[in-house]
Amino acid sequence: MASSSNYNTYMQYLNPPPYADHGANQLIPADQLSNQQGITPNYVGDLNLDDQFKGNVCHAFTLEAIIDISAYNERTVKGVPAWLPLGIMSNFEYPLAHTVAALLTGSYTITQFTHNGQKFVRVNRLGTGIPAHPLRMLREGNQAFIQNMVIPRNFSTNQFTYNLTNLVLSVQKLPDDAWRPSKDKLIGNTMHPAVSVHPNLPPIVLPTVKKQAYRQHKNPNNGPLLAISGILHQLRVEKVPEKTSLFRISLPADMFSVKEGMMKKRGENSPVVYFQAPENFPLNGFNNRQVVLAYANPTLSAV
């Protein structure tokens, strides 16, 4: 069912519970988070600094961590992988080289906390925050992930102690067929239809449904939310081969508009939306998911 686009509906995605405890731009000292020393990441990925001068280029940023997990009365499990998606960003939003430099020069720790019975893994960046940066990690200094979505599920539900032993920053260039809102949409105040897949994951922003599609529904006055809700059953998720934590949705070409996006026009090809999610994100459809309105740039504030 589609939700309203009021302030409270959108603000739950700007400030979900895992982040609200510390507030924006407040970096927490290491001694308040963990006894361990921070670790500096290595780098892998599709980094071509010439791309930072091309406005229509987007990159996905992921931290790939190796952690040791210790629990009370259980032996330590070493070498557990974790995939921690940081977000997708275009050069319209922030220079690529500056983002990579800030991520690589930061020192990181990892901790666990529980909120309303849900267990989270929090990655903490120890360094100076960048208040207007599109990536939450650089904007706020910490980012929380649902535990059972970022580490293997075959561990008990007891309280764990995490020891971060290795960290890699993965920068992945999105393919040329990627749809992203255009520059004026990113820096303006236009909201887009989006699919919510979990209360603590950001909604997946979609292109606007073509006006012709509105007329196929009983009440076209409800606009893009109703139009998207009526065709969720047609959307399918695919894992992008050889990419970490990157997924895509191919949209029906006859129902979605790509005019406002950065996609290169290739005949009648369908627009493709890329998004980040944990590696074990379910590849089923979006039917019965909640539809909301959201900004493409999470640094914008609802008014």
UniProtKB/Swiss-Prot annotation:
<dbReference type="GO" id="GO:0039576">
    <property type="term" value="P:symbiont-mediated suppression of host JAK-STAT cascade via inhibition of JAK1 activity"/>
</dbReference>
<dbReference type="GO" id="GO:0039502">
    <property type="term" value="P:symbiont-mediated suppression of host type I interferon-mediated signaling pathway"/>
</dbReference>
<keyword id="KW-0468">Viral matrix protein</keyword>
<dbReference type="InterPro" id="IPR008986">
    <property type="entry name" value="EV_matrix"/>
</dbReference>
<keyword id="KW-1198">Viral budding</keyword>
<keyword id="KW-1096">Inhibition of host JAK1 by virus</keyword>
<dbReference type="GO" id="GO:0039660">
    <property type="term" value="F:structural constituent of virion"/>
</dbReference>
<keyword id="KW-0945">Host-virus interaction</keyword>
<dbReference type="GO" id="GO:0055036">
    <property type="term" value="C:virion membrane"/>
</dbReference>
<keyword id="KW-1187">Viral budding via the host ESCRT complexes</keyword>
<comment type="subunit">
    <text>Exists as a dimer until it reorganizes at the plasma membrane into multimeric form. Interacts with host TSG101. Interacts (via PPXY motif) with SMURF2 (via WW domains); the interaction positively regulates virus budding.</text>
</comment>
<dbReference type="GO" id="GO:0033645">
    <property type="term" value="C:host cell endomembrane system"/>
</dbReference>
<keyword id="KW-0946">Virion</keyword>
<comment type="similarity">
    <text>Belongs to the filoviridae matrix protein VP40 family.</text>
</comment>
<keyword id="KW-1114">Inhibition of host interferon signaling pathway by virus</keyword>
<feature type="short sequence motif" description="PPXY motif">
    <location>
        <begin position="16"/>
        <end position="19"/>
    </location>
</feature>
<keyword id="KW-1039">Host endosome</keyword>
<keyword id="KW-1032">Host cell membrane</keyword>
<dbReference type="GO" id="GO:0039702">
    <property type="term" value="P:viral budding via host ESCRT complex"/>
</dbReference>
<dbReference type="Pfam" id="PF07447">
    <property type="entry name" value="Matrix_Filo"/>
</dbReference>
<dbReference type="GO" id="GO:0016020">
    <property type="term" value="C:membrane"/>
</dbReference>
<comment type="function">
    <text>Plays an essential role virus particle assembly and budding. Promotes virus assembly and budding by interacting with host proteins of the multivesicular body pathway. The interaction with host E3 ubiquitin ligase SMURF2 facilitates virus budding. The interaction with the nucleocapsid and the plasma membrane may also facilitate virus budding. Specific interactions with membrane-associated GP and VP24 during the budding process may also occur. May play a role in genome replication.</text>
</comment>
<keyword id="KW-0899">Viral immunoevasion</keyword>
<keyword id="KW-0922">Interferon antiviral system evasion</keyword>
<dbReference type="GO" id="GO:0052170">
    <property type="term" value="P:symbiont-mediated suppression of host innate immune response"/>
</dbReference>
<keyword id="KW-1188">Viral release from host cell</keyword>
<keyword id="KW-0472">Membrane</keyword>
<dbReference type="InterPro" id="IPR038057">
    <property type="entry name" value="EV_matrix_sf"/>
</dbReference>
<keyword id="KW-1090">Inhibition of host innate immune response by virus</keyword>
<dbReference type="GO" id="GO:0044185">
    <property type="term" value="C:host cell late endosome membrane"/>
</dbReference>
<dbReference type="InterPro" id="IPR043079">
    <property type="entry name" value="EV_matrix_protein_N"/>
</dbReference>
<protein>
    <recommendedName>
        <fullName>Matrix protein VP40</fullName>
    </recommendedName>
</protein>
<dbReference type="GO" id="GO:0020002">
    <property type="term" value="C:host cell plasma membrane"/>
</dbReference>
<keyword id="KW-1043">Host membrane</keyword>
